[in-house]
Amino acid sequence: MTPDQPLRVVIADDQASVREGLVLLLGGLPGIDVVGAAADGEQALALVAEHQPDAILLDLHMPVLDGIGATRRLAAEHPGVAIVVLTTYADDGSVIEALQAGARSYLTKDADRTEIAQALRTAAKATGSALAWPA
């Protein structure tokens, strides 16, 4: 991603209304291009392999492959893709597990679209195991 290119993002959430809402909210922001939306971790991995996004916005609790499992695989298979968790779970254990699995940022679903967009941008700019929390 260069400064003049939009941030390419995949969204993964098992709740259709949340997933579709995030596509509309983030896709309407300048500088963000939502390139795919998945209902589970396996679909998310396939979309990341297909589209090579800069970042993925990922829920923790999804069917087939949950967010932690998807985060571990994404971090191993696509280390250049920034992983940002967006979930309803704010407990320390969930935060620590997600960050240890490879997430660069962790937000709860009460974050507004500006906070989510900033977390995605900050995480995409981070390198290595740098963490952006909160963004």
Residue ranges and their predicted role:
Residues 31-39, 47:
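Short hydrophobic/Thr-rich beta-strand motif most characteristic of the beta2 strand and flanking loop
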Residues 13, 59, 87:
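Active-site residues of response regulator receiver
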Residues 46, 68-80:
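Short amphipathic alpha-helix used as the core "switch/output" element in two-component signaling
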Residues 51-57:
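Active-site beta3 strand of CheY-like receiver
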Residues 93-100, 104-135:
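Short, flexible helix-to-coil linker/hinge segments that flank and couple to helix-turn-helix
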Residues 18, 58, 63:
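The feature encodes the CheY-like receiver
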Residues 12-13, 38, 56:
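Conserved sequence signature across two-component system core domains
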Residues 40-43, 64-69:
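Acidic catalytic/metal-coordinating carboxylates
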